[in-house]
């Protein structure tokens, strides 16, 4: 029997990369019952897609119990990857249709495990279009870039 889910947690995630590959950052804004939590981090050498995935992973890891989640991302790579492509990748032992290894499979596997704990609605939003939650996540991702540039570990 599944545990009773808490009320809906709204999560907004974004990734940023200065060069691709290059220095990158991720950010996540979690909102629940009037509370907010901001998460961000960065890496010195990464890709935009890794940062988009890491934003989602770190946000879901921050949830302390099974939750109903509305997850907003401006990354079609993340949204389609988790909603459509992952099922075929798993059937093909983490290979694409043309038999090449799935890029970022380490993060996709981690995300796949995390999604099993929660009921998640995956929502795509257009980036840089004035959506408050997405704009805030973008600001956090850029803060992550700055921490990576300074060599400071983030939260």
UniProtKB/Swiss-Prot annotation:
Subunit structure: Monomer.
Cofactor: record remark: Binds 1 Mg(2+) ion per subunit. May bind a second metal ion at a regulatory site, or after substrate binding.
Keywords: Cytoplasm, Endonuclease, Hydrolase, Magnesium, Metal-binding, Nuclease
Subcellular location: Cytoplasm
Name of the protein: Ribonuclease H
Positions contributing to Mg(2+) 2 binding: 14, 138
Domain annotation RNase H type-1: ranges: 5-146
InterPro entries hit by this protein: RNase_H, RNaseH-like_sf, RNaseH_domain, RNaseH_sf, RNaseHI
Names of the cofactor(s): Mg(2+)
Family: Belongs to the RNase H family.
Positions annotated to bind Mg(2+) 1: 14, 52, 74
PANTHER family: RIBONUCLEASE H1
One of the record's GO cellular component terms: cytoplasm
Domain of life: Bacteria
Entry's EC annotation: 3.1.26.4
HAMAP family xrefs: RNase_H (MF_00042)
UniProt GO BP: DNA replication, removal of RNA primer
Keyword set includes Ligase: no
Catalytic activity: Endonucleolytic cleavage to 5'-phosphomonoester
